[in-house]
């Protein structure tokens, strides 16, 4: 995932044909299967003398919020500096979106509490799913990530506080709103998820960082149970990422050992340790003091340790490719 394609995003107010361009992909509200009866271009021009467009504006805003998160997911594949810049742009757009939503939804008296409760439930589920689509970034991206999550929470709060005051008294219209929300949530569920929840994406792979501790053999088994392997390192960038992440937790098992033959280091897939990774051993390691046959991330490098000791571990498996259509 090292391609340098830059994510490009147009301001919401200046988009033509209701489209967003991201990393060479075109996201079109008009071409989507989610088609509110009123277009996005009505946002700036619709006034209070039509009830339905106001509600469809709400749906459009929700859909745009979803698109912003898809854009955020796309720009996560770009280098760190560019990724951070694009995330900051998305945060600004999302802030403006929240402000616009607040000013567009009128406050008046509404009825039909049963249908409003169903709509509220759909909004809450939609918001939860949107938040689940945000990749978990490390280091410098954490603050911007928190801001985006905060903006979405504020957006949900505004929606829930005003859902009871929608100027829609016709039961059939409220039913249409409910069906639109159900359809939006269904479409959102279909969005590609590269990694399972609680896993971290990097360079086309998914990584699971354990919260409990096991001995080396049990860690190998734990990874197999989730159709993964105790982590095998294939690049310097991957090594740096894993070393930094594990350093904060403490000694962490990797999928390397010399259990089969002393001083012959093999990964769990049977491949030998490349000479270019020898530089990652801590000073004086491996020293095989007391039959230390399994390798851990320790401090700033690698250390051989006793396999029966309990430590954290990292599982790795290939990310699920997104299918088109």
UniProtKB/Swiss-Prot annotation:
Glycosylated residues, per the record, are 112, 141, 303
Q: Which residues bind Ca(2+)?
A: 285, 287, 289, 292, 303-304
Where located? Membrane
- Which molecular function terms from Gene Ontology are attached? (1->3)-beta-D-glucan binding; D-mannose binding; metal ion binding; polysaccharide binding
Cytoplasmic face of the membrane: 1-52
Record-annotated C-type lectin domain positions: 201-316
Cystine connections = 195-206, 223-315, 294-307
Q: Name one GO biological process term.
A: endocytosis
Q: Keyword set for this entry?
A: Calcium, Disulfide bond, Endocytosis, Glycoprotein, Lectin, Mannose-binding, Membrane, Metal-binding, Receptor, Signal-anchor, Transmembrane, Transmembrane helix
Where would you find the membrane-spanning parts of this chain?
Answer: 53-73
The protein's name = CD209 antigen-like protein B
Species in which this protein is naturally found: Mus musculus (Mouse)
């Amino acid at each position: 995932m090292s391609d340098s394609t830059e994510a490009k995003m147009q301001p919401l107010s200046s988009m033509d044909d209701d489209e967003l361009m991201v990393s060479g992909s075109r996201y079109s509200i008009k071409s989507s299967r989610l088609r509110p009866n009123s277009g996005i271009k009505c946002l700036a021009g619709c006034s209070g003398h039509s009830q339905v467009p106001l509600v469809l504006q709400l749906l459009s805003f929700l859909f745009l919020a979803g698109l912003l998160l898809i854009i955020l997911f796309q720009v996560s594949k770009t280098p760190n500096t560019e990724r951070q810049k694009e995330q900051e742009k998305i945060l600004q757009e999302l802030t403006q979106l929240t402000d616009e939503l607040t000013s567009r939804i009128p406050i008046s008296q509404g009825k039909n509490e049963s249908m409003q409760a169903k709509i509220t439930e759909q909004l809450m589920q939609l918001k939860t799913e949107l938040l689940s689509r945000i990749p978990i970034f490390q280091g410098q991206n954490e603050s911007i990530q928190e801001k985006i999550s905060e903006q979405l929470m504020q957006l949900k709060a505004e929606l829930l506080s005003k859902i009871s005051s929608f100027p829609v008294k016709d039961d059939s219209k409220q039913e249409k709103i409910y069906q639109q929300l159900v359809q939006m949530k269904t479409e959102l569920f279909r969005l590609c998820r590269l990694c399972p929840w609680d896993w971290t994406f990097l360079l086309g792979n998914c990584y699971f960082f354990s919260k409990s501790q096991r001995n080396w053999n049990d860690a190998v088994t734990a990874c197999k149970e989730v159709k993964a392997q105790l982590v095998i390192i294939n690049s310097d960038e991957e090594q740096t990422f894993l070393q930094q992440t594990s350093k904060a937790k403490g000694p962490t098992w990797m999928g390397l050992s010399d259990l089969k033959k002393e001083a012959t280091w093999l990964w769990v897939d049977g491949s030998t340790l490349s000479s270019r990774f020898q530089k990652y051993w801590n000073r004086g390691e491996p020293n095989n003091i007391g039959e230390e046959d399994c390798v851990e991330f320790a401090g700033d490098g690698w250390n051989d340790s006793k396999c029966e000791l309990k430590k954290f571990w990292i599982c790795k498996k290939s990310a699920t490719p997104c299918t088109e259509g």
